[in-house]
Every structure is written in structure tokens, then in C-alpha cells.
């Protein structure tokens, strides 16, 4: 058995070994490497009866989010529902109204993905939906069935011995909350289609400003890879750092942001809840000793680092609130930090360890072609952090991750 202090290092060595294989995997596409053995598929662990995943209540931010109100055929929100005519899914449709086929696009996407998994897992068996959108009031108050955000499912052969594994397949398909609710079915639900919580990860608003090396202040939406922006070095001093890539860039997406406001000096920074921010519990802590924590964990009375004259200085958090804004940008600098709206932040999100994240991105600093390859998207989440996030889920403890996970990573 390895000593406790060594285990994280061993995990990280596995990280680095796998990262070395990334250029070939991305450059050559799918295919078997000569002389390699096929790895057996990852063993899926069925959910136990009455188990739910994630292990939080359904209508919380870390799962499917709050109830937003019943949708009737006559309501304005009815247009949010779309029919699902997938021939690989059997809809029970007891009401003979087609209601069970109606659902949000997010729910439809997850359900279609699950249908493929079911056929692959059990040849000749299809996914069966016993309940989708409910307009008749047959469920409990504030049920997500009333919004088309929930489905109850079985397999077409109604073999109850399959339902635990069916629930696990639903988790893998990307449903935001899965509950092995009954011996007769599995309950699955998703976040609201227009809720900013349906997309998370680590970003700043499009209009958030950074300082370039020439002294100019520009919005993140105008920053380009190769620009040098104000950041913080390992020793806690201000420095200018190269922008390598955008980990996420979505100019037309509504996002929920955590707003951190300070006093003396007054600053206001908006960033997504899963993003890392440097904090301390008192103002005497040296800048290099400020610790990284998720923005959603920051409390009034704690201290963040802000740019001042000279250098960086602590500022007391006066208020924390939430705000929804259009557009989100997440640049990665060579130092792994940046100063946004005069507040020092990490470039990383979703995982609680800033230093581990910085180490995991070393290939992008050593091999620029990884950042600039033809597979780099102009919008959306860059493939590299998505790959790291999925890999980290296999190697690191669950407590290492923010419950909201990462945008576009299937979490």
C-alpha cells in the first residue's frame, strides 16, 4: 500500500503518461495502435434500489435545479417542449395524446443518447418511456414532469433485473439527476433548458476587462491568443503572461455568475460558481499563500487579491450575489492566473486544486501545436480541458470536483 502522501503523486503520474498519448490520439483519429492490446470496457456499476446520482436532492443546483413552474399547452413556455419521434425508443403514451413524447431539448438529447447505450448493452432491447411531460397533475407538487424535464424509463422487455444498470447508463448518458425510484421504473431529469445553471464550468462575462502589457484595458471578448495580460506569478507578484488558448468561449450563451464585491479598495468581479478564486481569512496573509477555492464557496469577510499600487493587495469581501449575463470566456495564460476587473483569479475551474490543474496543462506550454491544432474550436469548450476533466473523474476523489462540473464535459 502506498503512503498517503504518495498516492496523489502516483495518480498524477498516470495523468502525465496519458497526456503524452494525446497528440497521436487527436492527430490520427480513431484506430488501433500497432502492437497495442484492446482495453476492456470500463465496468459499469448498477445503481442500488433507491439510490440517486448525484447524491444531492433533485431540485438543487448540483442536480437538475429548481422547479420553474408547470407548462400547459396554452402557456408561452409550451414552445420549449419538442416531440421525440426516435424509432429506437418506445413511448407508453397511456393518455393517447402524445404527451409522453414531449420534452425539453436537453432531455431529448440525453434520452436519445441513452437509447443507443441500451441497444449496445442489450442487443434486441429498446429503451421504453412510461412517463414524460405530464399535463394532468398525476405527480407530486413541483414535479419536473410538469416542465418536460423528467422521464420515467424501463427497458422494452420490462426485465427489472436490468433497471439498476439502466440507471447507471442514464447517468453516463448525461442526465443531471437519476433515481432508481421504483422497482417498476427509473426516474431521470435534466436542468432547465433556459436556465443558466444548465451550463457551467469556469468563465468570466464577455465584457469583463483585463489589462494588456501596453497598459490598455480590453474586454475578454477582444483578447486573442498571444496577447500578454496582467496575471500573478508563483511568488505572488504581478506579472504579464501570454494567453495560450481559450478553455471555453461562448459569446451567445447565457450563464449564471457569482458576483464578488470588495471594499477598501472597491472591486466587483463576476465569474462562474465552479471557477477558482484566491482567498485568505485575514489581510496579513502573504499573496503567495492565498489559497484557491471555488467562487461559490467565497464568503463575506474573507479576503481576495486585487491589483493596487504597488503590486497586489488584499481586499475584504463585502458581498456575494448572483447574476446572469450573456457570453462567457475562459482564457488560459502561461502562469495559470489572470487579473480580471482588477481581481486576481485562477484560469482553472471544476477541480479544487489549482496547482494540480496548472501541472496538468504543462503539455500546452511545452507543445504549442496542441493548443493551435486544427481541432481547436472557435467556440465552445476546448477538447483538452474536456479530456482532463473526464480523466480526472476516473483518477481523483469525487470531493475534488465542484458539483456543477464543467461546461460541455458531460457532467
Curated annotation (Swiss-Prot):
Site-annotated residues for Cleavage: 202-203
Organ and tissue specificity: In the adult kidney, found in proximal convoluted and proximal straight tubule. Expressed in the developing eye.
Inactivation phenotype: Almost half of homozygous embryos mice for IHH died between 10.5 and 12.5 dpc. Also some lethality occurred in late gestation, most of the remaining embryos developed to term but died at birth, due to respiratory failure. Mutants display markedly reduced chondrocyte proliferation, maturation of chondrocytes at inappropriate position, and a failure of osteoblast development in endochondral bones.
Cellular component terms (Gene Ontology): endoplasmic reticulum membrane; extracellular matrix; extracellular region; Golgi membrane; plasma membrane
Lipid-substituted positions (N-palmitoyl cysteine): 28
Keywords of the record: Autocatalytic cleavage, Calcium, Cell membrane, Developmental protein, Endoplasmic reticulum, Glycoprotein, Golgi apparatus, Hydrolase, Lipoprotein, Membrane, Metal-binding, Palmitate, Protease, Secreted, Signal, Transferase, Zinc
One BP annotation, GO: self proteolysis
GO MF annotation list: calcium ion binding; cholesterol-protein transferase activity; patched binding; peptidase activity; very-low-density lipoprotein particle binding
Residues the record lists as binding Ca(2+) 1: 94-95, 100, 130-131
Chain positions of site Involved in cholesterol transfer: 248
Residues making up the signal peptide according to the UniProt record: 1-27
Glycosylation sites: 282
The EC number(s) this enzyme carries: 3.1.-.-
Lipid attachment in record (Cholesterol glycine ester): 202
Residues holding Zn(2+): 145, 152, 187
Superkingdom in the source lineage: Eukaryota
Statement: the UniProt record of this protein carries the keyword Chaperone: no
Residues where Ca(2+) 2 binds: 95, 131, 134, 136
Record site: Involved in auto-cleavage: 272
Marked site: Essential for auto-cleavage: 275
Role of this protein: Plays a role in embryonic morphogenesis; it is involved in the regulation of endochondral skeleton formation, and the development of retinal pigment epithelium (RPE), photoreceptors and periocular tissues.
Subunit structure and binding partners: Interacts with BOC and CDON. Interacts with PTCH1. Interacts with glypican GPC3.
Record family assignment: Belongs to the hedgehog family.
Protein name, entry field: Indian hedgehog protein
Organism: Mus musculus
Gene from which this protein is expressed: Ihh
